[in-house]
UniProtKB/Swiss-Prot annotation:
This is Protein Tlp homolog. Residues 30-56 are annotated as: Disordered. Pfam families: Tlp. It comes from the Bacteria. InterPro entries: SASP_thioredoxin-like. NCBIfam families: SASP_tlp. The gene is tlp.
Length: 71
């Protein structure tokens, strides 16, 4: 049997996901300072960072939606 949907902790989980993604983004920015990276490696990191930024925006929008649903 499937577990019931407990939405009470969704905001907290989403906030943790935002924080983790921000930390990954910051680490990637530090990695970009490495002069031994190839152009392809640098490009891959920058593309991944764009996706991370999009994820952060999406997570924050979900947080707003979840918060409004709870109140």
């Amino acid at each position: 049997m499937a577990k019931p949907d407990n939405r009470n902790d969704n905001v907290e989980k989403l906030q943790e996901m935002v924080q983790d993604t921000i930390e990954n983004l910051e680490e990637a920015h530090e990695t970009l300072q490495n002069n031994s990276l190839s152009r392809d490696q640098r490009q891959a990191i920058m593309e991944k960072n764009k996706r991370r930024e999009e994820s952060i925006r999406s997570f924050r929008n979900e947080i707003k939606d979840e918060y409004q649903d709870l109140h």
